[in-house]
């Protein structure tokens, strides 16, 4: 099996890296197969970057034009002035989309924190989104507290930091500890060190329940069966999302919160089925 480092290198090698200047700052985008028609835009999770989609971008790009953003304030994108949480990023996100795609609506896939961003954008600038896929999103009023998350202290050794990353990945992101490799810990460290968005208040709210009434696009949901945020309550989500045009709600067996990483083949198959080229 290819190491995660080689997977990342292969995806990066086949991507075109774009630095897009907007009024809110410079945004970094990676694109695969840009000429393949309607854009599929991928928004990653909190404390992440485009590499949250490392196991998806190449398979998806065999059928679609795939555009992965480093969220403003995360990854290599600049932090917009005053931005602290997902509700501050709708305008920067819209600016990036308009710079790249003009007025063309896109298919948008939002994972976790990225799904919150997509939800705000769909409510505030609905013309920019044709179809939306929510992947393990919080903000639905049901997210479990994760009591065994651990923080970092000044002066920690590299080994101590890696131990905390391992603990936190297993607590919230990954269900099967066999999916946590040294390469994944290094990737997590690199992503976390670039996280300049320091608030996560909205993730613990039910904001999407009210926003969904303003969504005009069709909506799909993909969740991991073992998502730590929704242990014991996953079955309630389709009813909670009854206020939008929810077309499908897919649950992938055995996968945790980071479903597109732990069950990439199943996820890619479902996503392409939900977002066929029109």
Predicted regions and their residues:
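Catalytic histidine-centered segment of alpha/beta-hydrolase-like enzymes
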Residues: 255-264, 268
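Flexible "cap/lid" loop of the alpha/beta hydrolase fold
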Residues: 119-123, 130-160
């Amino acid at each position: 099996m290819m190491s995660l480092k080689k997977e990342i290198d292969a995806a990066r090698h086949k991507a075109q890296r774009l630095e897009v200047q907007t009024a809110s700052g410079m945004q970094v985008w990676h694109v695969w197969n840009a000429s393949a028609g309607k854009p599929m835009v991928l928004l990653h999770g909190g404390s992440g970057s485009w590499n949250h989609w490392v196991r998806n971008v190449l398979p998806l790009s065999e059928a679609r034009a795939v555009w992965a953003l480093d969220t403003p304030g995360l990854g290599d994108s600049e932090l917009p002035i005053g931005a602290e949480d997902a509700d501050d990023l709708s305008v920067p996100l819209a600016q990036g989309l308009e710079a790249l795609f003009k007025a063309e609506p896109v298919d948008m896939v939002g994972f976790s924190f990225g799904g919150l961003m997509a939800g705000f954008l769909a409510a505030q600038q609905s013309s920019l989104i044709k179809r939306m896929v929510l992947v393990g999103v919080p903000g639905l009023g049901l997210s479990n507290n994760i009591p065994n998350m651990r923080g970092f202290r000044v002066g920690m050794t590299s080994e101590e930091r890696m131990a905390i990353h391992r603990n936190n990945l297993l607590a919230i992101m990954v269900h099967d500890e066999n999916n946590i490799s040294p390469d994944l810990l290094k990737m997590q460290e690199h992503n976390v060190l670039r996280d300049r968005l320091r608030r996560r208040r909205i993730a613990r709210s039910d904001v999407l329940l009210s926003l969904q009434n303003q969504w005009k696009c069709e909506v799909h949901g993909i969740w991991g069966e073992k998502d730590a945020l929704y242990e014991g309550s996953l079955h309630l989500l389709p009813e909670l999302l009854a206020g939008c045009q929810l077309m499908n709600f897919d649950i992938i067996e055995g996968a945790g919160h980071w479903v597109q990483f732990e069950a990439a083949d199943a996820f890619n198959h479902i996503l392409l089925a939900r977002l066929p080229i029109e």
